[in-house]
Amino acid sequence: MFLTHQRVAETTFADVLTALWLAVDPMAPTEWFLDNLVGPIMDRLTAVLGTPMLGYPFMQRAYLAAVCIAVIGPLVGTFLVHREMAMLSDTLAHTAFAGVVVGLFLNSALSLTLSSLVTAFVVAIVTALLVELLVEHAGAYTDTSLAMVLTGGFAIGSILITATDGGISVGIDAYLFGSLATVSTANVGILLLISLVVGGLVTLTYRPLLYVTFDATAAQAARLNVRLYKRLMVVLTALVVVSAMQIMGVILVAAMLVVPVAAAARVARGFRQSVTLAVLADEFAAIAGVTLSYSYGIAAGGSIVVTAIGVYIITLAVQKLAPSLRRLDRLQPGHSEAGLKADGGEKE
């Protein structure tokens, strides 16, 4: 009798959980955000600018995804570049590709229903922690070890693809080169969530991360948990890389974390200003790149990266020309008060 009541209770509890899961749509907040906030803004811009592409739902998702990536990319990338870890983002992107293929391979071989994005997150995070563990024992990041991890991850992915006679090759191109059409509501929801997590954690741990980035020895002496903050940074990098992979592609996703930061470093006067300028540069590149991608039917990732490189070239030119322009300005008549008095005139 007791067993019967226990089974009924267990069944009822399971039914309640199932009903709650079916009743509460995990994507409902994202759909509400797109329909009630992003949609009306895009519709207004469509009316003002006369560009119908802003009214298409898939373009609204693409723009929102690009904007999110352009925020979290430099937010993490600035710390990476100043720690001379820029290659880590590329390494994690290629191992994340192996994670995608692992998920597709298991679904094909074992008839499972795993999300390839979940397996990509798992593989990227595990790889990030393993790389950090290797660094702790080696004492420094080495291009050789990162290159081996990068090529090894990509090699595993290619082996699994060919092991099924190309049966899982469908959709791989979208991960390699990025695609606007494949950015779903679920992708946007994940990006929004990761943006909040990454932004929140970087804000809360900004000073310790800054301390560890520039002087890990002094941070250790100040009794900061240097190992914890270093591992936190590589895990955040893995989250950013995988979440951006769908629109940027595996091959180009690292550029979102590196190129805008390099451009900002040319003109910034401090770390905080460097982060701000990198985000602004990345936002410009993302919005312009998505627009060019739709207008000319070219890859979104490639468009964004080429635009970002263009911004870098401009900042490089500004940095090189600024001293010459200042010298020319000093030679202009009436530049100094002494020059004005010597001429016997006044500045109008």
Task: Give a label for each model feature.
Residues 298-348:
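Cytosolic-side transmembrane-helix boundaries in multi-pass membrane proteins
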Residues 1-70:
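Membrane-interfacial amphipathic/re-entrant helices at transmembrane-helix boundaries
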Residues 59-70, 113-125, 192-196, 243-256, ...:
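Structural signature of hydrophobic alpha-helical transmembrane segments
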Residues 78-93, 100-167, 264-276, 295-297:
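Short loop segments and helix-boundary regions at transmembrane helix junctions
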Residues 17-19, 44, 48-49, 146, ...:
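Transmembrane helix-bundle core of multi-pass membrane transporters
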Residues 94-104, 148-160, 182, 226-230, ...:
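Small-residue-rich segments of transmembrane alpha-helices in multi-pass membrane proteins
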Residues 188-260:
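Helix-loop-helix "hairpin" substructures at the membrane interface of multi-pass membrane proteins
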Residues 253-302:
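Transmembrane alpha-helical segments in multi-pass inner-membrane proteins
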